[in-house]
């Protein structure tokens, strides 16, 4: 397999305006707005408070990360494959699907309907999942764009309106996604583009990613997945204990060594929203940064914005995630097989 090297000149190619991945990322705000404006089929009210809430399907863990701290009833994100025995007529089952939902998701959802559970289903109207869950107790949120995050935000807004979680304003979340698209646009020069700058900070290195809060941790895992796909490098999102162990095992650089002699990737520590951590996590971030500095490991930071500008947890999550996904997209563009770079 050819070793990949970074060619930063590719990041200034005017043809990037037509890059399919970048165009998809730029459309995140529009997809969130479309999902918000979709009229639900069926309706629930705040009076219909369930005994418990079960969420299955794509982005179930995102819904859990947002709702778990404030949901007034027991809440669970279920990995499948079977439906828990306790689910019944007093419970709410939320299903996040798409046109080709996994067979176990469809089966679980259909079983929940048979047991009389109240349902919220996000899926295309013509999908197998929508057909399998059609009932008098089902509220369908029709989706059209195939964007699990947009569907999840629409569901979170509905659950917030029902008093089952925090208030989520999709229009504000969409604005946050649009702002990232603007500053990370392929037409923005490298000197002012945080997506391109972050991509170069990650290039030819092994990213070790830490997000201290629940939602930042969720974003860190999604970003690590995107970097692995973009570069083939085993980027790792982990908790502070694991990263502590890895950083302590790093051998400090030999100032006299020839960097071209080793094929081993140097690590880079990526800290998410380090400037917005709750007080109990500030010391953890400082410790990781000191460990990295002690062994000459580069530190790069992804922020969801200035502290003085208030934003909801979901807005911050989307900002972090989109910045990381832009960086992964630019990293893929910049990486060139060695033979082509010569």
Specify the residue positions occupied by each region the protein language model found.
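A generic structural motif
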Residues: 75-82, 122-124, 233-245, 296-308
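Glycine-rich phosphate-binding loops that contact phosphosugars or nucleotide phosphates
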Residues: 47-181
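Short helix-loop-beta junction
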Residues: 64-76, 224-236, 290-295
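Short, highly selective alpha-helical patches that border small-molecule cofactor pockets
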Residues: 25, 60-64, 105, 151, ...
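Phosphate-moiety recognition in structured ligand-binding domains
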Residues: 1-40, 117-125, 129-137, 143-144, ...
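Glycine-rich, anion-gripping cofactor-binding loops and their flanking helix/strand elements
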Residues: 85, 93-106, 247-282
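Active-site phosphate/pyrophosphate-binding segments
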Residues: 12-20, 24, 28-45, 144, ...
């Amino acid at each position: 397999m050819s070793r990949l090297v970074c060619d930063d000149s590719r990041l200034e190619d005017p043809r990037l305006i037509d890059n399919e991945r970048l165009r998809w990322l730029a459309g995140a705000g529009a997809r969130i707005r479309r999902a918000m404006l979709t009229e639900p089929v069926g309706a629930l009210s705040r009076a219909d408070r369930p005994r418990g809430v079960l969420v299955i399907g794509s982005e179930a863990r995102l819904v859990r990360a947002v709702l778990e701290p404030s949901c007034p009833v027991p809440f669970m994100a279920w990995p499948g494959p079977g439906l828990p025995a306790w689910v019944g007529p007093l419970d709410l089952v939320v299903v996040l699907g798409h046109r080709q939902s996994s067979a176990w998701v469809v089966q679980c959802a259909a079983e929940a309907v048979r047991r009389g559970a109240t349902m919220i289903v996000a899926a295309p109207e013509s999908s197998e999942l929508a057909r399998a869950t059609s009932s008098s107790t089902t509220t369908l949120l029709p989706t059209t764009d195939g964007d699990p995050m947009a569907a999840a935000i629409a569901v979170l807004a509905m659950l917030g309106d029902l008093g089952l979680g925090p208030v989520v304003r999709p229009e504000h979340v969409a604005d946050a996604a649009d702002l990232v698209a603007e500053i990370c646009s392929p037409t923005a020069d490298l000197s002012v583009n945080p997506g391109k700058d972050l991509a170069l900070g990650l290039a030819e290195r092994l990213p070790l990613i830490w997000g201290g809060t629940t939602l930042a941790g969720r974003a860190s895992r999604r970003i690590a997945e995107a970097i692995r796909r973009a570069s083939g490098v085993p980027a790792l999102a982990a908790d502070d204990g694991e990263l502590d162990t890895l950083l302590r095992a790093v051998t400090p650089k030999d100032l006299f060594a020839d960097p071209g002699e080793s094929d081993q990737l140097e690590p880079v520590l990526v800290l998410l929203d380090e400037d917005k951590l709750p007080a109990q996590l500030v010391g953890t971030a400082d410790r990781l940064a000191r460990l990295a500095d002690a062994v000459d490991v580069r530190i790069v930071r992804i922020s969801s914005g200035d502290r003085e500008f208030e934003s909801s947890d979901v807005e911050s999550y989307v900002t972090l995630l989109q910045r990381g996904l832009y960086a992964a997209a630019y990293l893929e563009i910049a990486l060139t097989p060695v033979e082509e770079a010569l």
